[in-house]
Amino acid sequence: YAIMETGLGGRLDSVSICTPVISVITSISLDHAEILGDTLSKITKEKVGIIKPMVPCVTINSHPDEVQTIIENECMKKKSPLIITTNSKQLLYTIGLKGNVQRENARIAELVIKTLNPTFNETYIKQGLKNVKWYGRNQIVQKQPLVIFDVAHNESGIASFINFYQLLAKGKKILIISLQSRKKINSQINAILNTFD
């Protein structure tokens, strides 16, 4: 298998010319709003373009209702089985990545594997999730003093990073951040100001 990630939405993304064996929709946020639309509904309508007829779609269970409804409707329209992660905060495996969003991603990965191959050896899933590394996401570069590197660049990514950071940080908290001027992080400004010195 090859995993192909859309770079921009789904409907107009070059990846959409491929016929997948499974489609995955992770969390949806106001990213690329200048191209995809300025609301979650508009962005979701673009993202669901990755769903293909009769091809299973895996997604998370924590979408806002408006987003979930659009995904469900698209799957029904295309007769695509919709597989949604469980609500459980407990993950059956230890994962090598830190943060709540990574547990959510691990649930998605597990569902994808089990959908494609229901008899896949659980030991391999367990080992893979335990040993996975994702540089640039909640990456602890140094422990004393604590230095974390993260490439978060949208509101949901920044919220996830702050959530992770607050679990570990003690003492003086310094943030070095660089964003393109077109990035809209207004909803995270207060969280940033309240978290860092």
Task: Report each predicted region and the residues it spans.
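A conserved short coil-to-beta-strand element within the FAD-binding core of flavoproteins
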Residues: N87
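Conserved catalytic-core segment of NTP-binding enzymes
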Residues: L8-R11, C18-K79, I185-I189
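Nucleotide phosphate-binding/pyrophosphate-handling subdomain across enzymes
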Residues: Y1-T6, L12-V24, I28-S29, K42, ...
